[in-house]
């Protein structure tokens, strides 16, 4: 099978791990209608944060090679990620994405951590219309 990504992946038991990445804050200077985003350092500082956090879709992109390695192109066409962000990541911090699924299942557990073990996000990945409730579904029903 030809893979869409040449990302080096590591298998640890039933867990598939991506490489350590240093995401870049692509929204650092984002503004709309003269409103600064939380991703802007100045606004983040006003709110008491050290710097603007990396945006969520950047973290989601770390899961594309993992989902594609498990489910192939089907994940790219009809895959779903659902996650609860637990801690912010600032530019320059290392982040690693993980996915764990039972063989043959159409859903999996996902999470990402910083190098020091801090949880960045946790949730679910799935393909197709018959996957069990996503992380968001479960959270909304708490």
Describe each model-derived feature in a short phrase.
Residues 1-28, 85-142:
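HotDog/MaoC-like acyl-thioester-processing domains
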Residues 2-78, 132-142:
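Hot-dog-fold acyl-thioester-processing enzymes
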Residues 44-93, 100-106, 111-120:
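Extended, compositionally biased flexible segments
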């Amino acid at each position: 099978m030809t893979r869409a990504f040449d990302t080096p992946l590591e298998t640890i038991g039933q867990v598939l791990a991506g490489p350590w990445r240093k995401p870049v804050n692509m929204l650092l200077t984002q503004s709309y209608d003269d409103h600064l985003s939380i991703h802007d350092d100045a606004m983040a500082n006003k709110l008491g944060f050290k710097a603007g956090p990396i945006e969520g879709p950047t973290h989601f992109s770390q899961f594309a090679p993992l989902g594609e390695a498990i489910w192939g192109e089907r994940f790219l066409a009809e895959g779903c990620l659902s996650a609860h962000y637990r801690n912010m990541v600032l530019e320059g911090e290392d982040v690693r994405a993980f996915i764990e699924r039972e063989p043959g299942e159409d859903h999996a557990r996902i999470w990402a951590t910083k190098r020091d073990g801090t949880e960045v996000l946790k949730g679910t990945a799935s393909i197709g219309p018959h996957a069990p409730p996503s992380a968001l579904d479960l959270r909304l029903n708490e």
